[in-house]
Amino acid sequence: MTPLLRFLNRTSLVTQIVIGLLAGIALALLAPAIACDLAFLGKVFVSALKAVAPVLVFILVMASIANHRHGQETHIRPILWLYLLGTFAAAVVAVVASMLFPSHLVLSTGEATLSAPGGITEVMQNLVLSAVDNPVNALLNANFIGILTWAIGLGVALRHAGETTRTVVDDLSNGVTLIVRMVIRFAPLGIFGLVSSTLAQSGLNALLGYLHLLAVLIGCMLFVALVMNPLIVFWKIRRNPYPLTLLCLRESGITAFFTRSSAANIPVNLALSERLGLHEDTYSVSIPLGATINMAGAAITITVLTLAAVHTLGIPVDLPTAVLLSVVAAVCACGASGVAGGSLLLIPLACSLFGIPSEIAMQVVAVGFIIGVLQDSAETALNSSTDVLFTAAACLAEERRNP
């Protein structure tokens, strides 16, 4: 065995990712031209994750439900409530932070050509339409709502199939999981390419003009990740939540930060859930579900940028409106994965609460894209790490009640 292979076998994946991260930063600073060329490594890694994630979710959920035995508990309902509670709590934190540290934007005059949903009804309609999408189309376009719908439907139908059929489905699940593990082993190389090319191309100059807004956004996300989420987990498991919280941030949050895709991070979260010894019938459904509806980071982004526009325009905000904004942001965030452009394109919907015209709201969206290098990364890291955190908390709480 070569020294390189021995090193790779002895070193944990997280350590390899940190080495790739530091090497990427160093290369971007020392040789930006070479770093730009290495963007290919990052693109290949993210493309591989995005390619395998829809198939993984479809097969894994279908196999989990098809092979489910009567009497087994899956604990999905408490996890779903944790997802909704966490998203609403994040929106409340963002409202409070925006009131304490109001941000002011220099809104650009350029017209945006993006299209945003016209109301909460339209967001919910999009979710329903996504759920009844053609299964082949859902797999091709990574429509995870549609994939989950078909996987659950087929899984329920196959529960009445013969033992041989269920065994084949289970073997398919094991095969796809093996491929995913192979893809994840290339995470250090992928993150090396992503970090080096992003820093070399964008630099940090584009972010300097929006430091205050970024500080509020990132501060809210850190507060939710390190204070609010641990409080929710403590309420659930009744013991020190920080070992579990920090483990999820380290193992899931770091990769999500650089891939900037909750869907691409699903395989990472499933692998972490397996290592934690969680209930497979539970996490195989709750992790993909969390990637579509557990959007604490998106709730923060929508709330902070909307209130930044409100403060810039001098619009007064009373307490009932602030509470309503929290609810709207939480509902919008749950639908963010079903909207092209994610959380940023749902900002005009929240702005409509304050009578802000769409032209100005879309300028706020443009500001969001400018700071997206950090905002989108931090948002995805919070969203994705919370998926596995709340899943683990619910499973551990159930084990505590039924040892």
UniProtKB/Swiss-Prot annotation:
Ranges that cross the membrane: 14-34, 45-65, 79-99, 138-158, 175-195, 214-234, 295-315, 327-347, 353-373
Reaction catalysis annotation: L-serine(in) + Na(+)(in) = L-serine(out) + Na(+)(out); L-threonine(in) + Na(+)(in) = L-threonine(out) + Na(+)(out)
Any one Gene Ontology BP term: threonine transport
Membrane topology note: Multi-pass membrane protein
InterPro entries associated with the record: Na-dicarboxylate_symporter, Na:dicarbo_symporter_sf, Ser_Thr_transp_SstT
Family: Belongs to the dicarboxylate/amino acid:cation symporter (DAACS) (TC 2.A.23) family.
Annotated gene: sstT
Disulfide bridge partners, by residue number: none
Pfam families in the cross-refs: SDF
Lineage: Bacteria, Pseudomonadati, Pseudomonadota, Gammaproteobacteria, Pseudomonadales
Main location: membrane
Location of this chain's protein in the cell: Cell inner membrane
Domain of life: Bacteria
Function of the protein: Involved in the import of serine and threonine into the cell, with the concomitant import of sodium (symport system).
Entry protein name: Serine/threonine transporter SstT
SUPFAM superfamilies: Proton glutamate symport protein
Any one GO CC term of the record: plasma membrane
Keywords: Amino-acid transport, Cell inner membrane, Cell membrane, Membrane, Symport, Transmembrane, Transmembrane helix, Transport
Molecular function per GO: neutral L-amino acid:sodium symporter activity
Coiled-coil annotated spans: none
